[in-house]
Curated annotation (Swiss-Prot):
It comes from Oleidesulfovibrio alaskensis (strain ATCC BAA-1058 / DSM 17464 / G20) (Desulfovibrio alaskensis). Its EC number is 3.1.26.4. GO terms for cellular component: cytoplasm; ribonuclease H2 complex. Pfam families: RNase_HII (PF01351). The gene is rnhB. It is found in: Cytoplasm. A divalent metal cation binds at D45, E46, D157. Its main location: cytoplasm. Residues 39-257 form the RNase H type-2 domain. Endonuclease that specifically degrades the RNA of RNA-DNA hybrids. This is Ribonuclease HII.
Length: 263
């Protein structure tokens, strides 16, 4: 059974708390803080939480520890890695294969609009993050991690950790966690996760643009731009729109009679 610690972390009764460092970092724009976490910790971030259309996508990344023999190579290969929002699309696409090659494990979780509307975006984000952990697979540096070792610690971007009951239900794991505000800019594994989540989701939205033409998904990726909202007013919502979102409802209202036949 999980227990709350004085740091506000969720730790299992099996002694996982012993893996935690004595002092956990807060957001620090000076640079990555990965060395303050247990070896083989998992960095987690999401993309698309605030969008009006498309799924919310999360990624999880485990990088080799700072003292690993491959560390100098990783530092060079991932030079300039930071919050995906601060990187150009070209740079993100260059970093994506490098991250997968340098990672011990990486995974992606996707939750679609119908589920978002049913359980709300926050719960959907928790589920996407949990799915990313469940889908962790071997990366290019898989051999550096002991075989069969489960995730030992989750560093989650933002101000909230994944509720223990959600993580347990999706992954079967009870793992200590910490939420780090601005973690995508100061923890390399979270930065890597932010890039994988963003590139994966952008690719999905570009593909969806071909199926649901007229909305401009390939351009705005589902965010609430003026052009996107105008397209919803003109065409009505499609199956990729989040009907529970406040900005979608007014634009979709004139098409309410067509809601049962979303294309």
């Amino acid at each position: 059974m999980a227990a709350r610690t004085k740091n506000g972390l969720t730790a299992s009764a099996s002694g996982m708390q012993s893996l935690l460092p004595h002092t956990l970092p807060h957001a620090d724009p000076a640079g990555p803080r990965d060395s303050l976490y247990p070896a083989f910790f998992t960095g987690i971030d999401e993309a698309g939480r605030g969008c009006l259309a498309g799924p919310v996508v999360a990624a999880a990344v485990i990088l080799p520890p700072a003292g690993a023999p491959a560390a100098p190579h990783i530092a060079a290969a991932l030079s300039g890695l930071t919050d995906s929002k601060k990187l150009s699309e070209k740079r993100r696409l260059t970093l994506e294969p490098a991250i997968k090659s340098c990672a011990v494990r990486w995974g992606v979780g996707v939750v679609w609009p119908q589920v978002i509307d049913r359980i709300n975006i926050l719960q959907a984000t928790y589920r996407a993050m949990s799915l990313a952990v469940r889908h962790l697979r071997g990366g290019g540096a898989a051999a550096s991690m002991p075989a069969g070792l489960p995730p030992v610690f989750l560093a989650v971007d933002g101000d909230k950790t994944i509720p223990g009951q959600v993580l347990q239900a999706v992954t079967g794991l009870s793992v200590p966690q910490e939420a780090i505000v601005g973690g995508d800019g100061c923890v390399m594994a979270i930065s890597a996760a932010s890039v994988l989540a963003k590139t994966f989701r952008d690719r999905l939205m570009t593909a969806l643009d071909k199926r649901y033409s007229g909305y401009g998904f390939a351009t705005h990726k589902g965010y609430g731009t003026a052009a996107h909202i105008e397209a919803i007013r003109r065409l009505g919502p499609c199956r990729m729109h989040r009907l529970s979102f406040a900005k979608v409802k007014p634009a979709a209202a004139p098409h309410a009679a067509d809601q049962n036949t979303l294309w």
